[in-house]
């Protein structure tokens, strides 16, 4: 998370909060500077421009989430996956809210953000395979993209998650853990019966 011991960290924290609340359009350099108790000139001194500040926010959010996931996977097959998710989501709730807002805005910076998350996810999956947590796949890259977009889609549609399931994914660990339990059930036990999978493959083979 952010250290508030220096001006740069305060600026990053203020920028993330502004983006979370009102998107990038509502995150003016002047407003961020006021929230961080610094001058607008100091914001530009550290980050060059508003775009530079947003890029730094993206990088910090990704690095923090990456650290959480890497620490969890390093525990190997005996890891408490859902516990790790709950603990990290409690710490990273402001960053999750930032991502949920940032992802809906589109554009090249968001494309780059998603591409980086897919690349990071591929690394986590490889580590999980090596540690015995995740099964290998002949479609490893495609599977990684699917899982990443599945997760990001839930963040973008968080309003409907709360409306239909009755809990928020953005306000702390409880909602994220409940969502993760549903996902873990699907991933661990599957959705289709072996007979249904066999029938689908037979149809593909004869198509």
Predicted region positions:
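Amphipathic alpha-helical segments used for helix-helix packing
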Residues: 77, 87-118, 122, 159-163
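Amphipathic alpha-helical interaction segments
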Residues: 10, 98, 116, 139-149, ...
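Hydrophobic alpha-helical connector segments
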Residues: 56, 67-100, 140, 144
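Short, Lys/Arg-enriched anionic-surface-contact patches
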Residues: 1-10
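Amphipathic alpha-helical packing segments from all-alpha helical-bundle domains
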Residues: 65-70, 107-133, 142
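Helix-turn-helix
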Residues: 10, 14, 18-52, 56
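Solvent-exposed, amphipathic alpha-helical segments
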Residues: 10, 14-21, 68, 98, ...
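C-terminal peripheral helix-coil segments that are non-catalytic and often amphipathic
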Residues: 119, 123, 127-131, 156-207
């Amino acid at each position: 998370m952010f250290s508030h011991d220096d001006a740069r960290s305060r600026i990053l924290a203020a920028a993330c909060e502004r983006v979370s609340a009102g998107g990038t359009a509502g995150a003016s350099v002047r407003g961020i500077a006021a929230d961080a108790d610094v001058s607008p000139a100091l914001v530009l001194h550290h980050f060059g421009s508003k775009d530079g500040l947003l890029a730094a926010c993206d990088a910090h959010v990704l690095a923090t989430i990456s650290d959480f996931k890497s620490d969890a996977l390093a525990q190997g097959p005996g890891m408490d996956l859902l516990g790790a998710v709950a603990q990290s989501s409690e710490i990273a709730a402001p960053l999750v809210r930032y991502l949920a807002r940032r992802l809906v805005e589109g554009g090249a910076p968001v494309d780059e953000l998603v591409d980086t998350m897919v690349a990071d996810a591929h690394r986590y999956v490889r580590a999980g395979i090596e540690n015995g947590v995740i099964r290998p796949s002949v479609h490893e890259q495609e599977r990684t993209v699917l899982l990443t977009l599945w997760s990001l889609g839930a963040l973008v549609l968080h309003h409907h998650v709360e409306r239909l399931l009755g809990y928020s994914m953005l306000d702390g660990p409880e909602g994220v853990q409940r969502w993760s339990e549903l996902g873990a059930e699907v991933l661990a036990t599957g959705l289709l019966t072996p007979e249904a999978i066999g029938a689908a493959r037979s149809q593909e083979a004869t198509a």
